[in-house]
Amino acid sequence: MKPRDLIARASAWIAELRAQLPLGRRGERAAEKFLRRNAYRIVARNFRAAGAEIDLVAMDGDTLVFVEVKTRRSRDAGAPEEAVDERKQKQIRRAAEIFATRYRADDVTMRFDVIAVDASGERLEIELLRNAF
């Protein structure tokens, strides 16, 4: 492959990622509003540790909830929640352990939820999957 072709491919890939980023942020904002309306208290956003990121950390009563938000424009690539595969779950669990240790929450009940945001229509559709993994 010629360097020029490689640069063109990389540029197209970067442009595609940039186009997706606002959708992801929009989904995270919608998920946060959804959680607040359902009496969750947000304690952290985009927590990064161990090479992973947890989109939202919230309290649901006395339970510390780590929330992964997945947003899709269409289901062509599968349902949003299907993107939270075993590898991603492992990364989130590792980051959650670090969060719990850092903020001395080791003795708190923890849960892992996924929020699937469907952006294929005029309005965002949000589905909460409690205890997703």
Would you name each region that the model predicts?
Residues 5, 102-133:
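Domain-level recognition of nuclease-like catalytic cores that cleave nucleotide substrates
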